[in-house]
C-alpha cells in the first residue's frame, strides 16, 4: 500500500509532507525549496509550467500566468469576490458553464479546479520523486471557512490530478495536529491562520491524542494577496501623480508592481523601510520612465489597517461560539505567511491578551498536519482522534423564503440530521428542495448549494403529506441530501456538487488531459536529456579527435566526423529516437578513438617511466655535485 501524502494547497504557495518512521517530513521540490508557488503558466508551445518556473516568467507572460486560483474555486462568476479579482487580474477571468468561473488563456477556458489540479499534480510529482514510488492518495487541506461547493471543487481538483483525496481537512485543524501531536496536557488553543488568500480562526481543546474543534470562523477572501494589492494601488497612484501614467492599464507593468509589492511586504516584516526600484517600468513620448520610491513600515500599516482589523470579528465570534473568553485560551498558534507581519502579531496580542506561540513554521505546519492525518488514516499514527466541525449552518428554504436549519454551524462532523416537512398548497404534486448554507434567517441571504425535486406526491390537502428531509454531512464537510415521502416510501436524493458545475464527464476529460500533459512533460524531459547527452558526446569526441591529431588514421577520422555530423543533424529535429540512434552510432564509431587513446596512454606510463628514471639516475651519477651544508645550531 502506497503512502498517503499531506498537501497544503495554498493560495500563494503549496507544501507537501509525508510520514516517515513515525515522523512527518516536509518534502523539498526539485529546486530545493520546501514550498512551491501555486502558479501555473502556459508557454508559447502549449507547455504548462508549474511552481517557481511559472512565477519567474510572469512579468513577460502576465496574461497566461495564473495565480491565486484557490480564491476562485467553487465560486460563481457573479460572486462579489470574483468581480473584485477580475478588476486587478492580469489574466482573463470570464463566465463559464452554468454561471461558473473560468480562466481564459488563448481561447481555452480553464476551471479554477483544473488550475488547482495542476498545482496538486506538481506536489504529487514532488512526493513521487522523493519516495521513488507512485502516489495515488492524499489528505488535502482547505480553509476552515470554505463552504460545501469549495470543498467539493477541491476534491474534484485532486481527482483531476490523479489523486484519491482520502480526507479534506481544515487548515487550522491540521495546524493543531502538528502542534499538539505529542502534548499530553489538556489545552485550549486558538489557531490564527492568515494566509495568502484566506483567513481562518479555530478554537480547539486538545490533549492526550484528542483534537476537538469547538468553533471556527473566518473570511475566505482576506489574505496576503489583498495586502499586496494595497501596495500595488499605492505605487500606481504615486506614479500617476508624478508622471500622469496609470500603470494599472499595462498588464506587464502591473505584474512587475505585484512582484515588487510582495517583496516589499515581506521585507517590512523585518525592516522599518524598503526601497522599491523598478527601472524602465513604462515609457512615453519623452522617453523611458522609472519608478523609485521608499515605503516605510508605518505607511504600509496605514494602507492595510482595515484588512488587519477584519480579523478581529471572526476571532471574537469564534470565542463566543466556543463559550470561552480570551483569557481561557492557553496558546495562540500563528499559521500562514501573513502572520509574520508585526502589525498582525500585535493585533493577535490585543485580541487574546497574550503573546502568540511561535514554535511552528507557519508555512509548513498545515502540510505537516495533513501528513499526520494521512498517517492516522493509514494506521501509522495511533491514538489520535480528530473531531472537526462544519463552519456554516445547513438548511432548506421553507414557506415565505425562510431558511430552516437542519445542521447548525460548529456541529461536529460527520453528522446526520432529519426533519419532517409538509406541502404548502392543496394537491401539491411535488416539492422543491432548495438546499442552503449560511447564517441568515432568509433564504436569499444564504448561499444556494443545491436544488432537487421530490415528485409524484399523492394528491392531498396541504399539511397532510409527510416529507422527511435528511442531511448527511461526511467527515470532509461534504453534504448529501435526501427527501422521502413517508406515505409512499418514494425517495429522491442529491449529492451536492460544487457550483463550479463539474460533471463526472468533465472531471474524466480533465483527468485525461492532465495525464496527457504528464506524458508530454515526460517526453519533453526525455528529449532534453537526449539533447544534453548528444551535446556532451559531440564535445568529448571532437576534443579527443583534436588531442589525438595525426595518430588517427584518415578512414577512422572520416567515419567519426560523419557520425558527429549525423548527431548534429538529428539535434535539429525533435525526434528523441533519431537522436538516441545517432548517439549510439557515434558511440560505436568512437570506440576506435578510445583504443588509440588507451594505446597512447600505455606508451607514456609505468614501463617507459621507469626507464626514464633509470636513465636520469645514470646522468646524475656522471654529474655528481657535492653540496656544502652548514649545520645551524
From Swiss-Prot:
Stimuli inducing this protein: By stress conditions e.g. heat shock.
| Stretches for region Disordered | 599-633
Q: Which residues carry this modification: Phosphothreonine?
A: 198
Q: Which Pfam families match?
A: HSP70
Keywords in UniProt for this one?
ATP-binding, Chaperone, Nucleotide-binding, Phosphoprotein, Stress response
Question: Highest taxon of the source?
Answer: Bacteria
Q: Where is the composition biased (Acidic residues)?
A: 622-633
InterPro entries per record? ATPase_NBD, Chaperone_DnaK, Heat_shock_70_CS, HSP70_C_sf, HSP70_peptide-bd_sf, Hsp_70_fam
Cysteine disulfide links: none
Any idea which GO molecular function terms this record carries?
ATP binding; ATP-dependent protein folding chaperone; unfolded protein binding
Tell me which family the UniProt entry assigns to this protein: Belongs to the heat shock protein 70 family.
- Protein's job: Acts as a chaperone.
Q: Which PANTHER family match?
A: HEAT SHOCK PROTEIN 70KDA
Could you tell me what this protein is called? Chaperone protein DnaK
Organism for this UniProt entry: Desulfotalea psychrophila (strain LSv54 / DSM 12343)
